[in-house]
């Protein structure tokens, strides 16, 4: 199985990589690159909330892994001038776990819950009145003597992040006043991100070197920064330490990341669909078994970018590869492909929302 954040994933050094991720993470909306609509809207909402000395409305951020949901949550707290408490859905197993965090919040603080779609139903029930009325219902005692008491909470902002917005219950989703979807980044914005990260890390990088890394980063800043670190290793060991286009190209070829940003696992998925399932349609469970992966890995990690780039389509009967997949491997396009519709805009293809 592959890591959900993969490097395109190199093993080892994960702790150090995470420390570097924190070091290069933007701290303000002014430094936040890409997502112009989200940035403009959040700047407006934050300015309005600060002007009224109120907590920002509860905010839901969703999109594929690595696009900056956690970064945006931290920026919200920074711009609001408040503290942020971070946790995740799977960690909050009991209502008491959530209550302990909520009762320690200061007025207007931000509570960030990653993977919010994985909250247990019993914890979610406690969260509803906390979000809506800033009150916490707690049961005291047991059996016939049990009674419920209400504790007042300070106003706070819940920022929830998820890759699976479609798995949120309607009552929870409806309680978010602000909903933001993060899209895959274009190459120009990723090039800017790579150049900025290189500057923070003290690396010498040419614009074409940044472009080469950006165009293979699957539209994802997290992957772009990881590729930058691996290209840096290559440049220091087999070059003069400077990252040029040629250096980046050689390093990424060594990492088995092709010009489209596909790694071994992406190519394996596409070839399995072509060779074992005649291009599809194939169900996700059958596909997961064929490549020895978990269903959620295919749905959350592999598929979104392949769909957005137009290599895979979802149909009522299952997944189908498009002409682009055959052309990518230099294979002849089957005559029956003329019967398979190709979306006009793959960027609008819904991905588990």
Curated annotation (Swiss-Prot):
Region (Head domain (RuvB-H)), start-end ranges: 259-353
Entry keyword annotation includes Lyase: no
Annotated GO MF terms: ATP binding; ATP hydrolysis activity; four-way junction DNA binding; four-way junction helicase activity
Positions of the UniProt region annotated as Large ATPase domain (RuvB-L): 4-185
Protein name, per record: Holliday junction branch migration complex subunit RuvB
Function: The RuvA-RuvB-RuvC complex processes Holliday junction (HJ) DNA during genetic recombination and DNA repair, while the RuvA-RuvB complex plays an important role in the rescue of blocked DNA replication forks via replication fork reversal (RFR). RuvA specifically binds to HJ cruciform DNA, conferring on it an open structure. The RuvB hexamer acts as an ATP-dependent pump, pulling dsDNA into and through the RuvAB complex. RuvB forms 2 homohexamers on either side of HJ DNA bound by 1 or 2 RuvA tetramers; 4 subunits per hexamer contact DNA at a time.
Main location: cytoplasm
GO cellular component assignments: cytoplasm; Holliday junction resolvase complex
Residues that bind DNA: 295, 314, 319
Keyword Nucleotide-binding: yes
Localization annotation: Cytoplasm
EC number(s) stated in the UniProt entry for this protein: 3.6.4.-
Domain comment, as recorded: Has 3 domains, the large (RuvB-L) and small ATPase (RuvB-S) domains and the C-terminal head (RuvB-H) domain. The head domain binds DNA, while the ATPase domains jointly bind ATP, ADP or are empty depending on the state of the subunit in the translocation cycle. During a single DNA translocation step the structure of each domain remains the same, but their relative positions change.
Bilayer-crossing regions: none
Entry's Gene Ontology BP terms: DNA recombination; DNA repair
InterPro entries: AAA+_ATPase, AAA_lid_4, DNA_helicase_Holl-junc_RuvB, P-loop_NTPase, RuvB-like_N, RuvB_C, WH-like_DNA-bd_sf, WH_DNA-bd_sf
Lineage: Bacteria, Pseudomonadati, Pseudomonadota, Gammaproteobacteria, Pseudomonadales
């Amino acid at each position: 199985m592959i890591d959900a954040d993969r490097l395109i994933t190199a093993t080892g050094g994960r702790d150090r990589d995470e420390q570097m991720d924190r070091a290069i993470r933007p701290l303000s909306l002014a430094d936040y690159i890409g997502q112009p609509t989200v940035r403009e809207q959040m700047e407006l909402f934050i300015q309005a909330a600060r002007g009224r000395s109120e907590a920002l409305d509860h905010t839901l951020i969703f999109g594929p892994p690595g696009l900056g949901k956690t970064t945006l949550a931290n920026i919200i707290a920074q711009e609001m001038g408040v503290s942020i408490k971070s946790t995740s859905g799977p960690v909050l197993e009991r209502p008491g776990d959530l209550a302990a965090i909520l009762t320690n919040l200061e007025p207007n603080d931000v509570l960030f819950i990653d993977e919010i779609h994985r909250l247990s139903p019993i914890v979610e029930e406690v969260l509803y009145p906390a979000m809506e009325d800033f009150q916490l219902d707690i049961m005291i005692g047991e059996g016939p003597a049990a009674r419920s008491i209400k504790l007042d909470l300070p106003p706070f902002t819940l920022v929830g992040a998820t890759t699976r917005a479609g798995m949120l219950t309607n009552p929870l989703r409806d309680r978010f006043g602000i909903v933001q979807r993060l899209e895959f980044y274009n190459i120009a914005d990723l090039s800017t991100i790579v150049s900025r990260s290189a500057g923070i890390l003290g690396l010498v990088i040419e614009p074409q070197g940044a472009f080469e890394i950006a165009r293979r980063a699957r539209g994802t800043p997290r992957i772009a920064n990881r590729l930058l670190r691996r290209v840096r290793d290559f440049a220091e060991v087999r070059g003069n330490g400077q990252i040029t286009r040629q250096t980046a190209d050689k390093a990424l070829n060594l990492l088995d990341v092709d010009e489209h940003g596909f790694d071994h696992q992406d190519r394996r998925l596409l070839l399995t669909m072509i060779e074992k399932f005649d291009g599809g349609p194939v169900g996700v469970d059958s596909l997961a078994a064929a490549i020895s992966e978990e269903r959620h890995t295919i749905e959350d990690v592999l598929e979104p970018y392949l769909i957005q780039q137009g290599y895979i389509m979802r149909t009522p009967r299952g997944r189908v590869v498009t002409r682009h997949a055959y052309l990518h491997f230099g294979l002849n396009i089957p005559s029956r492909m003329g019967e398979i519709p190709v979306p006009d805009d793959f960027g609008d293809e819904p991905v588990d929302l």
